């Protein structure tokens, strides 16, 4: 059996739409100053998880990564890390998409919550690892102890963003899926 690997116009439009929403959601933020750099509470992670849940791993990861990277390119503070953001937020969408597509094709709120949780955990590990090695030790020249302080200072915002995404993305996914199905615009 041959697998259809063509990307449709509808899929391209959905990737672009969700990437734009991720970019805007990332911009809706409250910056928090820290000892080294800043952290932020924002809505981008909800939309990264939503991208993976609705579009699946590869297209959802692309939408999450592109939208987040575009936001970083628009902010001089983050532009130098946009390539890392593309990879890390892309992984967020990929992991959420892999979990939602694992097993039965049909999914519900519970499976969407597990997908958002796994995506959030994967992203948190990648983000805190980047904070320790890249931002802390490489870019700021911190000692190991200083890099750990930087990681610990990022934990509250990272945890808050993850919890909001774990709660919000499945609710949005179920509502959007139902509305799209009812209007015969199903994305499954």
List each language-model region with its residue ranges.
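Loop-helix junctions at membrane interfaces
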Residues: 1-188
């Amino acid at each position: 059996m041959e697998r259809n690997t063509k990307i449709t116009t509808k899929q391209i439009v959905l990737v672009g739409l969700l990437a734009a929403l991720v970019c805007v959601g990332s911009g809706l933020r409250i910056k928090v100053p820290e000892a080294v750099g800043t952290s932020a509470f924002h809505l981008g992670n909800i939309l990264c998880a939503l991208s993976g849940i609705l579009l699946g791993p590869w297209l959802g990861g692309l939408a999450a990564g592109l939208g987040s990277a575009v936001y970083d390119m628009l902010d001089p503070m983050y532009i130098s890390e946009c390539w890392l953001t593309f990879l890390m937020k892309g992984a967020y969408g990929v992991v959420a998409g892999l979990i939602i597509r694992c097993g039965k094709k049909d999914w519900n709120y519970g499976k969407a919550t597990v997908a958002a949780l796994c995506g959030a955990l994967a992203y948190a590990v990648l983000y805190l690892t980047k904070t320790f090695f890249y931002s802390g030790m490489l870019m700021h020249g911190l000692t190991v102890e200083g890099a750990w302080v930087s990681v610990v200072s990022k934990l509250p915002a990272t945890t808050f963003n993850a919890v909001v995404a774990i709660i919000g993305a499945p609710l949005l996914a179920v509502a959007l899926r139902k509305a799209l199905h009812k209007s015969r615009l199903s994305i499954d």
